[in-house]
């Protein structure tokens, strides 16, 4: 039974073909393919038309899929012109791919579909069923509705199945040569031993002289970096349910308790064990044995029950609330402890059920839930007051904005004022994406100081809203050279230090490559202990290390990179070797490569088909 419950939750199986998404067109509703006498079409592929009606339906399917993937962000993207255009083009491209594959399957004289297969598909199609049986009348009515003959309909089904078989064959037939397998495994199992030496920036370099002319040239070239950003001073009010002081009388708590008394009671629960078998005769035999030795229930459940979960727990399926007990078990009328049912038919299998325990429902006393009810009442009152105030503010902003400050005063809510801030120093309470978008949008506030600024009302989620008024504003302005001169000199010294350290490091590497260590030792450098680097390491140097050639005949390979602290690191590649993968690891790698290979094959076929085909687009949607 537990197996059945889990199956219901996992009843939808999503199949996909790697790399190529056909938008479920391969065996999609055939009716939208049949009627070729349409007035509008979106494209022709080698003379075969793709109807605009079909495009609209597939576009709708794709949009629904996007909704599920993007969730709440869907509506933000759906109004984006580029996003909409990309979706149009994507759907159209997949429709064209589908037609190309159909034509390819036909030209290859692909395996002819057996007539019995076609017959089986039609006979088992739900739309042609009546009372769980094939209805010829429904079938003929359907053909009439789509303006098709029986022969045309069968040919369409054949075309769809041939295309599906083609895709299936391609996806199954890809392979990797044994030699290629070995090379890839060897490449992925490779490890490298390195040593590192850190070349730090010499502090004395920071004392180098920088002329006034150098500083001025840098200032002029990088003026965009020397602006004082625009600044804001804001009046704001944060409205939350916490703004209100709420009182709650004992009578209110008592009334709430009486009104919602069912919420404060626990329902009766029952604990059952089951034995589930597929054969009725086996169930009857087990029941007969239990009549003689009921204490064997757990043992039999463990040994013979087909339910994979409860059989491991001696048949125990746990506690079930009285309102959630399946009807089949309810009708067995088990009311006594250790009472065993007769054989119960259950979803093509058979159950024997035992009642282990019963837990009677209880009613909580008011003192047990007093604090919880008090909290609920306060939350409700706060929410009601918040919504009332929110609506009042919203209405007055439209009709009489001058009243806003009086409304706030009546509710003992103070207007707060910020200090000057810019985009990098926004107060924490206002550091919310929607608020920042509003504050820094110059079109939404008045910079003319002769006009009195007005409040703007922004409603957020979770019962929170803000009244915001831009009180003062300062435009960004260029800083004077003298005010930033010290910072520029410091910056130029650092740039020079980096250049000189890099030059020195490159000279050391050249020396080491020639087999000399004099400059290395003069710089008081040393190599760290050996490190083993794998291709799967997430280190910043992994790609650098594996881009180096193999050391030859005892010679080491050297390279240089700059770390996050601006130090230069000399890397010495000492050794390259391979480890052995387990068979399981090899299979995982080869399976991934096989899938990737499938994608390449599909893309190659489609690219070739497009190049050889005549595809014409109509001006119905953006191409």
From Swiss-Prot:
It is found in: Cell inner membrane. It is a single-pass type II membrane protein. The chain crosses the membrane at residues 12-32. Signal peptide: none annotated. Residues 267-357 form the PpiC domain. GO terms for cellular component: plasma membrane. Chaperone that functions as a gatekeeper on the periplasmic side of the SecYEG translocon. Facilitates the translocation of precursor proteins across SecYEG by interacting with the translocating substrate. Also plays a role in the release of newly synthesized secreted proteins at the periplasmic exit site of the Sec translocon. Belongs to the PpiD chaperone family. This is Periplasmic chaperone PpiD. It comes from Buchnera aphidicola subsp. Acyrthosiphon pisum (strain APS) (Acyrthosiphon pisum symbiotic bacterium). The gene is ppiD.
């Amino acid at each position: 039974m537990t197996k059945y419950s889990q199956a219901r939750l996992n009843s939808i199986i999503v199949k996909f073909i790697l790399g190529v998404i056909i938008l479920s067109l391969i065996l999609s509703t055939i009716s939208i393919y049949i009627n070729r006498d349409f007035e509008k079409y979106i494209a022709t592929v080698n003379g075969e038309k793709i109807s605009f009606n079909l495009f609209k339906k597939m576009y709708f399917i794709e949009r629904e899929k996007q909704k599920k993937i993007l969730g709440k962000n869907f509506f933000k993207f759906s109004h984006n012109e580029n996003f909409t255009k990309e979706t149009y083009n994507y759907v159209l491209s997949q429709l064209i791919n589908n037609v190309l594959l159909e034509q390819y399957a036909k030209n290859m004289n692909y395996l002819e579909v057996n007539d019995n297969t076609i017959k089986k598909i039609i006979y088992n199609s739900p739309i042609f069923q009546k009372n769980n049986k094939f209805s010829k009348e429904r079938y003929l009515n359907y053909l009439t509705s789509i303006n098709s003959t029986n022969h045309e309909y069968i040919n369409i089904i054949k075309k769809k199945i041939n295309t599906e078989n083609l895709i299936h064959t391609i996806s199954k037939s890809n392979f990797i040569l044994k030699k290629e397998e070995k090379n890839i495994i060897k490449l992925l199992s490779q490890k490298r031993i390195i040593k590192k030496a850190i070349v730090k920036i010499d502090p004395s370099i920071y004392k180098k002289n920088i002329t006034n002319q150098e500083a001025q040239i840098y200032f002029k070239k990088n003026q965009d970096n020397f602006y004082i950003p625009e600044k804001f001073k804001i009046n704001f009010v944060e409205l939350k349910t916490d703004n209100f002081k709420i009182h709650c009388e004992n009578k209110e708590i008592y009334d709430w308790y009486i009104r919602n008394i069912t919420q404060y009671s626990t329902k009766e629960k029952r604990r059952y064990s089951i034995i589930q078998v597929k054969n009725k005769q086996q169930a009857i035999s087990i029941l007969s044995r239990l009549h003689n030795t009921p204490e064997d229930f757990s043992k039999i459940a463990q040994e013979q029950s087909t339910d994979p979960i409860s059989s491991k727990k001696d048949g125990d399926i746990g506690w079930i609330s009285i309102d959630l007990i399946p009807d089949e078990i309810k009708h067995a009328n088990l009311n006594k402890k250790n009472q065993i049912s007769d054989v119960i038919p259950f979803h093509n299998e058979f159950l024997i059920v035992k009642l282990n325990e019963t837990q009677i429902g209880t009613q909580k006393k008011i003192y047990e839930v007093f604090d919880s009810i008090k909290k609920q009442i306060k939350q409700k009152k706060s929410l009601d007051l918040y919504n009332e105030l929110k609506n009042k503010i919203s209405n007055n902003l439209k009709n009489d904005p001058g009243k806003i400050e009086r409304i706030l005063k009546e509710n003992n809510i103070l207007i707060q004022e910020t200090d000057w801030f810019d985009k990098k120093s926004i107060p924490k309470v206002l550091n919310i994406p929607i608020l920042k978008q509003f504050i820094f949008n110059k079109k939404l506030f008045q910079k003319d100081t002769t006009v009195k600024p007005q409040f703007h009302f922004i409603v957020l989620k979770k019962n929170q809203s803000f009244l915001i008024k831009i009180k003062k504003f300062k435009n960004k302005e260029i800083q004077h050279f003298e005010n930033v001169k010290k910072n520029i000199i410091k910056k130029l010294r650092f740039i020079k230090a980096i250049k000189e350290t890099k030059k020195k490091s490159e000279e050391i590497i050249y020396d080491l490559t020639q087999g000399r260590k004099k400059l290395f030792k003069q710089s008081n450098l040393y190599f760290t202990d050996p490190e083993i680097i794998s291709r799967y390491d997430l280190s910043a140097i992994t790609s650098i290390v594996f881009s180096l050639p193999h050391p030859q005949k005892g010679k080491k390979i050297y390279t240089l990179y700059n770390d996050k602290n601006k130090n230069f690191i000399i890397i010495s590649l000492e050794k390259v070797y391979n480890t052995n993968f387990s068979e399981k690891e090899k299979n995982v790698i080869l399976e991934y490569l096989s899938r990737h290979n499938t994608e390449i094959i599909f893309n190659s076929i489609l690219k070739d088909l497009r190049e050889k085909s005549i595809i014409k687009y109509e001006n119905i949607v953006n191409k």
